[in-house]
């Protein structure tokens, strides 16, 4: 029985600035606080799946530096298998996150070692893919590596979940190979060339995307919830109402939890309902 999740993607050392508002152009603005955290979409997603109890493996690169050591140590602490993380000469990837009091975030990432991932790294994990039920990908490593990983995952019989974030052009033939495409409203607007600013527009867009570009898709809508579309049907899943302290990583938690739920036999709607609860308490 295949019971593993393989996450291929990014590991970043995050600097999180707690601020009351974004500074104006040319303005120097004091942050209220600063925090340092292990991050990167790939690593965050892997940690959530591992915390829920799924055997989870991370494939990616970090630098031969202190930040890289921290990221590997943190992943191990939460149960992520790290033997497929390679150390390279490039500096470890970094994220700078501006976190506002209302829970919204504005982030910038430095590619660093994440763009050192090669086809050989994917080939090295070939046996692992054959034992994995799901491969999770994001868009924080080179696109050609993602496409190669999709091909290898499908050859190995894995279900592929692609978190198309940050949004970038993807050849349609590869989108159609993806089993589940996950985007937020900004990324959805990028691919549909149409603004997604209401739940109804999200439902319409998800139906369009699942019909034209991929097999199934999930639109995450922040505090509103999410929309799931597949096989010509669409469902809206409202968020769990909590007081948002800071939402960094909530979307990644959602994806890791979705992987867990799918491995445990839930259909996609039930999986997203489960993941919604997990991301609310991240």
Question: Where do the PLM segments sit?
Answer:
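Conserved phosphate-binding/catalytic loop of the ribokinase/pfkB sugar-kinase fold
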Residues: 61, 87, 97-134, 139
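Structural alpha-helical scaffold elements that stabilize or flank donor/cofactor-binding regions
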Residues: 127-128, 174, 210
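Glycine-rich phosphate/adenosyl-contacting loop at the front of the ribokinase-like
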Residues: 1-61, 66-73, 77, 244-245
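Alpha-helix C-terminal capping segments
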Residues: 46-55, 99-100, 261-265
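A glycine-rich helix N-cap at a beta->alpha junction
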Residues: 74-89
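Conserved beta-alpha-beta core of the PfkB/ribokinase-like small-molecule kinase fold
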Residues: 134-204, 224-226
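Conserved phosphate-binding/catalytic region of the ribokinase-like
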Residues: 2-5, 169, 199-282
């Amino acid at each position: 029985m295949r019971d593993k999740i393989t996450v291929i993607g990014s590991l970043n050392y995050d600097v999180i600035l707690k601020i009351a508002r974004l500074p104006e152009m040319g303005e120097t603005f004091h942050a209220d606080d600063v925090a340092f955290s292990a991050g990167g979409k790939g690593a965050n997603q892997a940690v959530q799946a591992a915390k829920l109890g799924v055997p989870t493996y991370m494939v990616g690169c970090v630098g031969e530096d202190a930040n890289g050591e921290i990221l590997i140590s943190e992943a191990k602490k939460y149960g992520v298998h790290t033997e497929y993380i390679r150390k390279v000469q490039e500096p470890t990837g970094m994220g700078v996150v501006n976190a506002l009091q209302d829970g919204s975030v504005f982030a910038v990432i430095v590619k660093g070692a994440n763009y050192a991932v090669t086809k050989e790294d994917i080939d090295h994990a070939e046996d692992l893919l054959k034992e994995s039920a799901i491969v999770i990908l994001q868009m924080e490593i080179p696109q050609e590596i993602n496409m190669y990983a999709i091909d290898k995952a499908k050859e190995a019989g894995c279900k592929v979940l692609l978190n198309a974030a940050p949004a970038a052009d993807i050849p349609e033939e590869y989108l159609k190979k993806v089993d589940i495409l996950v985007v937020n409203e900004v990324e959805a607007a990028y691919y549909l060339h149409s603004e997604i600013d209401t739940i109804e527009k999200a439902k319409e867009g998800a139906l369009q995307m699942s019909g034209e570009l991929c097999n199934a898709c999930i639109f995450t809508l922040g505090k509103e919830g999410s929309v799931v579309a597949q096989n010509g049907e669409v469902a809206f899943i409202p968020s769990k109402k909590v007081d948002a302290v800071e939402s960094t990583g909530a979307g990644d938690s959602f994806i890791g939890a979705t992987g867990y739920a799918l491995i445990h036999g839930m259909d996609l709607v039930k999986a997203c309902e489960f993941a919604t609860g997990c991301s609310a308490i991240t």
